């Protein structure tokens, strides 16, 4: 259960000695910066990978739901349903609107 040491070599040794509760902690400032940058880099890569996976999943789910919605609630299924109810001789006028739903009126 020891700490892993970095293999980075330092040319200038600038050390900070902190004394807390009679214990001496010696740390090198460049090593601390190197570890912080490494942690930030690893966290950034992890966050970016997670966001890309979420984007891919949402695109796939969106395509699936759009296809399913078009099949079940699309204009063709509404026309077929209306033809089955009123018979094939009924005249159907589809009024275009700028919304997601389509209004069907009989002429």
UniProtKB/Swiss-Prot annotation:
GO cellular component, one term: host cell membrane
Keyword line: Host membrane, Membrane, Transmembrane, Transmembrane helix
Lineage: superkingdom: Viruses
The keyword Nucleotidyltransferase appears for this protein: no
Annotated membrane topology: Single-pass membrane protein
Principal location class: host cell
Intracellular or extracellular location(s): Host membrane
Entry's transmembrane regions: 39-59
Family membership: Belongs to the rotavirus B NSP1-1 family.
Record protein name field: Non-structural protein 1, peptide 1
Organism: Rotavirus B (isolate RVB/Human/China/ADRV/1982)
Phylogenetic classification of the source organism: Viruses, Riboviria, Orthornavirae, Duplornaviricota, Resentoviricetes
